[in-house]
A protein has these predicted regions:
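C-terminal/domain-terminus segments
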Residues: 141-167
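Alpha-helical scaffold elements lining the catalytic groove of polysaccharide deacetylases
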Residues: 123-125
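Active-site region of glycoside hydrolase catalytic domains
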Residues: 1-119, 130-150
Length: 167
């Protein structure tokens, strides 16, 4: 079972943890050994796995979705109105460029703006994924990347470089 895909609002973190506990208890009454999957708030962000309470159940997997940097992976996406619908975004590119361009997209761009990485590329990707790995280790659970990718509007060569870095 995956409990719910992409809980969004940050203020729902506590309520999400309560719902997880109640739902896991209910599932365990009818399916003791079935693996249960859930992720953090803000679209299953790597940054929010650390907000999940440590599970009391051993058949739990944490999931995360990886679309960072969102500015690149979601460029020209009609469902993200704060991202330019006309400008090509390249990968990799200077970190300052990404930070400046990520500011207008609000908390969906915060991941880039708050990153410690000095370069946009493998250093940034590693920093992001290691946050998920650390959260899962601290919780004693297996980690699963449930979604990742790049929109078909991105330059093809840059998309291939992104996939190489994520690999």
């Amino acid at each position: 079972f995956e409990l719910l895909n992409e809980v969004v609002e940050q203020e729902n973190a506590e309520a999400w943890n309560l719902l997880i506990a109640e739902t896991v208890d209910a599932i365990r009454r009818i399916a003791r050994d079935t693996i249960i999957i859930y992720g953090g708030i803000q679209w299953n962000s790597v940054k929010t796995l650390k907000l999940l309470e440590k599970p009391k159940d051993e058949n739990i997997l944490f999931t995360f979705h990886f679309y960072e940097p969102l500015l690149f992976t979601h460029q020209k996406a009609h469902w993200v109105p704060t991202i330019s619908q006309t400008e090509d975004i390249y990968y990799p590119e200077a970190m300052d460029y990404y930070r400046t361009k990520s500011l207008p997209i609000g908390y969906q761009g915060e991941v880039v703006c708050k990153a410690q990485s000095q370069t946009m590329g493998t250093e940034f990707i590693t920093e992001m994924v290691m946050e998920a790995v650390t959260a899962a280790k601290n919780a004693g659970v297996t980690l699963y990347c449930g979604e990742f990718g790049v929109i078909d509007q991105a330059p093809v060569e840059d998309t291939l470089r992104w996939f190489t870095d994520v690999d």
